[in-house]
Amino acid sequence: MAEIKNYTLNFGPQHPAAHGVLRLVLELDGEVIQRADPHIGLLHRATEKLAENKTFIQSVPYMDRLDYVSMMVNEHGYVLAIERLLGIDVPERAQYIRVLFDEITRVLNHLMWIGAHALDVGAMAVFLYAFREREDLMDVYEAVSGARMHAAYYRPGGVYRDLPDAMPQYKASKIRNEKALAKMNEARSGSVLDFIDDFFTRFPKCVDEYETLLTDNRIWKQRLVGIGVVSPERALQMGLTGPMLRGSGIAWDLRKKQPYEVYDRMDFDVPVGVNGDCYDRYLVRVEEMRQSIRIAKQCIEWLRKNPGPVMTDNHKVAPPSRVGMKTNMEDLIHHFKLFTEGFHVPEGEAYAAVEHPKGEFGIYLVSDGANKPYRLKIRAPGFAHLASLDEMARGHMIADAVTIIGTQDIVFGEIDR
């Protein structure tokens, strides 16, 4: 009798459903996956090593480029670690702004995820809808930092600047007449806070639209229910965090269990799954978007009533004001020294973790008292999730591997670092 050999298939790295540069070596029995071996490192940029040669402030933009879909939350983990080593307090207003932008970033991430995941499985319309909403949030990023993606908005001691009084307006062009322009700029006549408020007032209807398209859709359920099941015990053993862990029924959320900034004042719920399959993880993330709306609304309400500083008054860390810098020589020298030489951080080590849209994003920082980190270790949530791919995909079809990669919400910037 002829012996049966398993078939080896290379999936990626140039594959539309591989979310970047994933190379999977699949061992197949017919169309059933026996083993999935992810090959990583194709997007390795030595971020941890680069940070050792840059001052503490100069490494903030590197954080944006880790998970390049959830930019500001990466920065948050990094600046929290520095603040713990420095022992400085962040002004209350800056903390609220950070929490607001963490939730904006969570929505940005989940919109990208729901669009890409649905597109991989074969539902194209959701992708277009999700990007329509992402555009508005990208504009908010641009309004506060000048960049649509890599913002570098969070700084040790606070944020780069307070929320501006005006939103960028759409300009007239060949494809937009005056009437269309007026409609597009309708929500942009007020401050950035007004625009964010308007967005989160409209957004629940948008989430309802995605749910109408997907939640009870027969094909969507056939593709997701019972696929990539992870038991609560295995989820903990494999180091899964975030929606991957909560989808298996464990209500672990750093915003509730180990609150940072002002999350302990926020009123929100932690959604958990029941079966630990792809469908449950989908439901958890959709509900997370709804909870982000609640948190953002609470932040907006507080920020409207409480003006104040957004940067610490410790001048060894905080740069002088732009106005002072242009009129006062001492301020100019101070600014120059701060951005060339940087500030010295006391000897010691600190670990700061934030509830990233993908899971627990941790920064372990070791300082030897210099103006640069001695060692920076990045704990990326996607790394543990990708490691669980083999176990989640065994016994499933090739098409289900695409679903499982989608449900893990993988971005290679943070995995390869």
From Swiss-Prot:
SUPFAM superfamilies in the record: HydB/Nqo4-like
Molecular-function annotations in GO: NAD binding; NADH:ubiquinone reductase (non-electrogenic) activity; quinone binding
A Pfam family: Complex1_49kDa
EC code: 7.1.1.-
UniProt keyword ATP-binding, yes or no: no
UniProt xrefs under NCBIfam families: NuoD, PRK06075.1
Entry's family note: Belongs to the complex I 49 kDa subunit family.
Protein name, per record: NADH-quinone oxidoreductase subunit D
Organism of origin: Burkholderia ambifaria (strain MC40-6)
Gene: nuoD
